[in-house]
From Swiss-Prot:
<feature type="compositionally biased region" description="Polar residues">
    <location>
        <begin position="88"/>
        <end position="99"/>
    </location>
</feature>
<feature type="region of interest" description="Disordered">
    <location>
        <begin position="63"/>
        <end position="99"/>
    </location>
</feature>
<protein>
    <recommendedName>
        <fullName>IQ domain-containing protein J</fullName>
    </recommendedName>
</protein>
<dbReference type="Pfam" id="PF15157">
    <property type="entry name" value="IQCJ-SCHIP1"/>
</dbReference>
<dbReference type="InterPro" id="IPR053113">
    <property type="entry name" value="IQ_domain_protein"/>
</dbReference>
<feature type="compositionally biased region" description="Low complexity">
    <location>
        <begin position="76"/>
        <end position="87"/>
    </location>
</feature>
<dbReference type="InterPro" id="IPR029362">
    <property type="entry name" value="IQCJ-SCHIP1_N"/>
</dbReference>
<feature type="domain" description="IQ">
    <location>
        <begin position="47"/>
        <end position="67"/>
    </location>
</feature>
Length: 110
């Protein structure tokens, strides 16, 4: 091989090496951004996913705060209504009503 050919072939190899380091550098930058430290290989994928999800959830909650201040949520069911409906289903001796289940054929025929 001639010297020019060797230089021409060597250049793509250097680019491949540079690309590998660039990819590793990008991964390290993403790990730092996601607050991921070095863990044993068996734990790293799970830990990194958990931290990414936690960060996304915090960002989601922060975005929801301004939205809640702009548009109030609909009124919730009051506890008074809930307690009155429960007390209506309770007998005076504090026992609760028991529903009798009938076979479907019996209810259709009668």
């Amino acid at each position: 091989m001639r010297l020019e050919e060797l230089k021409r072939l060597q250049n793509p190899l250097e680019q491949v090496d540079d690309g590998k380091y660039l990819l590793e550098n990008h991964q390290l930058a993403m790990d730092v951004e996601n607050n991921i430290e070095n863990y044993p290989l068996s734990l790293q994928p799970l830990e990194s996913k958990v931290k990414i999800i936690q960060r996304a959830w915090r960002e989601y909650l922060q975005r929801q705060d301004p939205l809640e201040k702009r548009s109030p949520s609909p009124p919730s069911v009051s506890s008074d209504k809930l307690s009155s409906s429960v007390s209506m289903n309770t007998f005076s001796d504090s026992s609760t009503p028991v529903s009798v289940s009938r076979p479907l054929a019996w209810t259709v025929l009668h």
